[in-house]
Amino acid sequence: KDIYCEKPISLTIKEGRNLVETCRRLGTIYQAGTQRRSTASYQFAREMVLQGKIGRVHTVESQVWIAGTVPHQKPSPVPAGWDYDQWLGPVQWRPFVQARVDNWTCFWDTGEGMHTDMGTHYTDQMQWVLGTDNTGPVEFETSDIVWPDPVKYMSETAISGTFRCRYANGINGVIYQRGGFNDRYIR
């Protein structure tokens, strides 16, 4: 069978490589959905870049909003009729906390933060618009990372920060994790 999956597709590079190798070995088609390539404005941007209508691209900047913080809460009973073990999947079992389920992106074992959640959409757009689908960045760097205070919060992933990358063709990419939901996302 072929596979369609939502992000995050893996939580480690090793998991990602295992996925690719397994699909190749089985002859399985794998697709991770990011739902942005069918958006008219992104299609227009790609056409403009690939046809050279905006000149030489040297940097692509994008932004995801800051992650929430989840205050410590006590475990509670699992809601009736809900299979918490299935929701957890292969991650280490933890007592049920509704806020943890609602804010799954704020924990390493279920979401890995906003860069892995929403940043996936914008990284895909950079790859697609630049025509680098079958390659990827050759250098990575993170900076300005702000972590939640573990005394106040149970959330684990970065609240804000900056992800920079460089492609083999010399184009730079930057994804900022800052601002709110309605801020500009790609320029």
Regions found by a protein language model. Give the residues of each.
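Beta-strand-loop-alpha-helix segment that lines the small-molecule cofactor/substrate pocket
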Residues: 1-38, 52
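Structural recognition of the beta-strand scaffold that forms the well-ordered cores
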Residues: 4-5, 11, 29-32, 58-62, ...
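Basic phosphate/pyrophosphate-binding loop/patch that engages nucleotide-derived ligands
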Residues: 21-28, 43-58, 75-81
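Short, solvent-exposed loop/turn segments at the edges of secondary structure
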Residues: 23-25, 39, 82, 156-160
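Core domains of carbohydrate- and sulfate-ester-processing enzymes
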Residues: 61-100
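Rossmann-like dinucleotide-binding domain that binds NAD(P)(H)
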Residues: 85-171
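Flexible, glycine/threonine-enriched loop-and-boundary segments that flank and lead into catalytic domains
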Residues: 170-185
